[in-house]
Amino acid sequence: MGALPVTIETGRSLPDYLPARMVNEFAYCPRLFFYEWVDGLFEESVDTVEGAIQHQRVDAKATALPEAADLPQSIHSRSVTLANERLRVIAKMDLVEVEGGTVTPVDYKHGRPREGPNGLELWPSDRAQLAVQGMVLRESGYPCEEGIVYYRKTGQRVRVAFDEELMATTERMIQQAWRTAAAPGIPPPLVDSPKCPGCSLVGICLPDETLVSEAAEQEAEPEQLGLFETPGRKPVKREVRPMVTPRSELRPLYLNSQGVRVGKSGAVLQVRDSQKLLQEARLGEICQVNLMGNVQISTQAVQGLCEAGIPVCYFSMGGWFYGITTGLNQKNVFLRRSQFRLAEQEYFVRALARRLVGGKIRNQRTLLQRNHVEPKRATLAGLKEMEERAARSASVEELLGIEGNAARLYFGDFAGMIKPDENEAAAELRFDWNGRNRRPPRDPVNALLSLGYSVLTKDLTVACYAVGFDPYVGFYHQPRFGRPALALDLMEPFRPLIVDSAVLTAINTGMVTARDFVRVGGSVALTTTGRKGFFRAYELRMDTLVTHPLFDYRVSYRRLLEIQSRLLARVIEGEIGEYPVFTTR
């Protein structure tokens, strides 16, 4: 790699050139710049999609720009790429106009210009990007005195002169961007900025959530830390703006019927049996594809799903989650490096495991209080004691014992949350509960729980990949061949809230009946109809809105899984010190 334009200690390997578009992002928000250029994270929005389509039209008409010595009096060259070797920046220009021997870069923007005190003007980020274009043109010997941005929404061209002040300011910004990219930590989020609600990465960045988590930690500092004065470190009360959409418009696709085949026609998945078309699903309307048992999928369909960033998840006939296919969209390697390093740090593993297990026990207790006809006081008191012991535990091994004792108390009273079915007597199998069993499950309730935990493991594995984690390197759950340990870590507090609740809903509302099970040897399995009924109950639960106790806004459980995964990433990257485990009242 060529020398950087400034003298810095690089904490990571950097590309040779800084794109002008990334200077635009840095001027808008250094944190956004870091996510997009360093971590390789990006999220589409309506504006980014429309802007990309418009730039594709410009790029399709690419024409060469003559050398500076051979420049004609008038020419329009499109999609021109040049670099500045001194500053290590590169710019792809939508249009370069040549009039009277002088060149002018023209950049196309989707939005509208800024209204300044003296009329229309460029936004600061657009001005910086255009200045970089002027720099690369001058470096290549072209006379360039000004630039133009064409704003499509208003159809207006706004000019800016490339004076010494603008070019010097932009050069300093380029140096700051290189330093930020090379630094070990991510820039802090903007505080109460009006830029955040319109940013396509707000669901990844979580600016207000990160700041609120930091403030909550300050309020909860141990008493002994109060013996020391820490100037400037006072708790700040903040409200979280509702910038994250409560629900995703995308839905998972479950294919449960044995023998069906999945193909692709254009941007549409087609599900067929041997004779007819059964179902169609647009790629733009689904977030994942789940194949249960003997379901075939074509290479063309897999390729299309990988290109669209939609994972394909594979389950056995019995509901065991055993594989996933994803595209090459996992770019956040620096998060994974930190994850691997902290997985070897006993203090971090113990602290995170305490919170995960404590949160799980608290949520088990809450579910009993909500749904049990008459929960035993001894059970509730025992669970509270187990939660307190988890917070004081000295090792992961001790936590495993505490978790096991809490599970015995919780599942010992689980039957009190199942309503008796009047039609059950005629069925071969019943929703009797005699304790937790698995591998294989030996009764209908345990068959539902096992399937539910498998599906939730899948959803958190997908969330881990989306954030940039390696789902197989956990903290509380130690790595084991074929086990997504980190997904199992994250799902601990959600087992009772999502799966156990969905199982109770499926049974108590008749979405799954005792006739939807078959006995195979010593195990019990769901029929195709039974699995379909449970998936309906599970997705109903995942779509339920719940209030986050720390941020005080309502989101669906599916959205919550991603938020909590990203909060763990904030902990691992050192932005916040303690994982805010999700518990409900």
Predicted regions and their residues:
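Metal-dependent nuclease catalytic regions and adjoining charged, substrate-binding loops involved
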Residues: 2-10, 73, 120-121, 136-219
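Active-site helix-to-loop segments that bind/position phosphate- or nucleotide-bearing substrates
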Residues: 59-66, 80-83, 229-263, 272-274, ...
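A surface-exposed, charged beta-strand/loop segment in the N-terminal or early-internal portion
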Residues: 107, 285-366
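Short histidine-centered catalytic/ligand-binding loop motif
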Residues: 109-123, 159-164, 290
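Metal-dependent nuclease catalytic cores in nucleic-acid-processing enzymes
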Residues: 120-148, 308-312, 454-461, 496-501
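Terminal-proximal segments
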Residues: 236-317
